[in-house]
Amino acid sequence: MSNFAVSLPEVIAVLPAAGIGSRMLADCPKQYLTVGGKTIIEHAIFSLLHHPRIQRVIVVIHPQDTQFSRLSVAQDPRISTVYGGDQRANSVMAGLQLAGQAEWVLVHDAARPCLHLDDLSRLLSITECSQVGGILAAPVRDTMKRAEPGIQAIAHTVDRQDLWHALTPQLFPLELLKLCLSRALREGVAVTDEASALEYCGYHPILVTGRSDNIKVTRPEDLALAEFYLTQRQSLNNDSL
């Protein structure tokens, strides 16, 4: 392990992967679909394990999952698994219980196979300057429309000046994230990402600019796009050798 990794706070990663991904219309959960020669979840895990500051990855799986244990990455000693819950917040909380005494926890979507190492490094660097944490995010470039309630018609255009697409990973002090998620769950607040729980509790995580090709595979057409990005990256890596 490098001196760089030892001198900075310990970071544990949690990868919620207990969902079934019904919008993909596939025969298996989307994280087990193959893209670029590996399953989506393998790409997501390897992008974390390749960084020297990530000590361990906790993969949160569905109680009836029989596929993760068959992957070669499941045998890596830095990988732990735990069963998740019905909602993302419950699954993340289950993962946090295995994080031990780590100072910081990084949560990454199992369905994001295109994370760049330099984006991850920029996010991890905030442990040196923030006590709240932050997320990878991309500024909104498209024109945004708000729909009329209940119908698919434009109500008005939304000012995109300060709008960002929330991405993952998202990085927070372990105990702070536990506290905020616990409160949100206890009070019945719907949180769609970990930053939402901190926002609910009055905190303001940092926005760290990330690449917009860090896509989440949600629909069938996303597979081809992820394949393109991964192939392009591999081609660039080969050209640099």
Curated annotation (Swiss-Prot):
It catalyses: 2-C-methyl-D-erythritol 4-phosphate + CTP + H(+) = 4-CDP-2-C-methyl-D-erythritol + diphosphate. Gene3D superfamilies: Spore Coat Polysaccharide Biosynthesis Protein SpsA, Chain A. Keywords: Isoprene biosynthesis, Nucleotidyltransferase, Transferase. The record marks 160, 216 as: Positions MEP for the nucleophilic attack. The record marks 23, 30 as: Transition state stabilizer. Coiled coil: none annotated. InterPro entries: IspD (IPR001228), IspD/TarI (IPR034683), IspD/TarI_cytidylyltransf_bact (IPR050088), ISPD_synthase_CS (IPR018294), Nucleotide-diphossugar_trans (IPR029044). It comes from the Bacteria. It is an enzyme of class 2 (transferase). GO terms for molecular function: 2-C-methyl-D-erythritol 4-phosphate cytidylyltransferase activity. GO terms for biological process: isopentenyl diphosphate biosynthetic process, methylerythritol 4-phosphate pathway. Its EC number is 2.7.7.60. Pathway: Isoprenoid biosynthesis; isopentenyl diphosphate biosynthesis via DXP pathway; isopentenyl diphosphate from 1-deoxy-D-xylulose 5-phosphate: step 2/6. Catalyzes the formation of 4-diphosphocytidyl-2-C-methyl-D-erythritol from CTP and 2-C-methyl-D-erythritol 4-phosphate (MEP). Belongs to the IspD/TarI cytidylyltransferase family. IspD subfamily. Homodimer. HAMAP family: IspD. This is 2-C-methyl-D-erythritol 4-phosphate cytidylyltransferase. It comes from Yersinia pseudotuberculosis serotype I (strain IP32953). The gene is ispD.
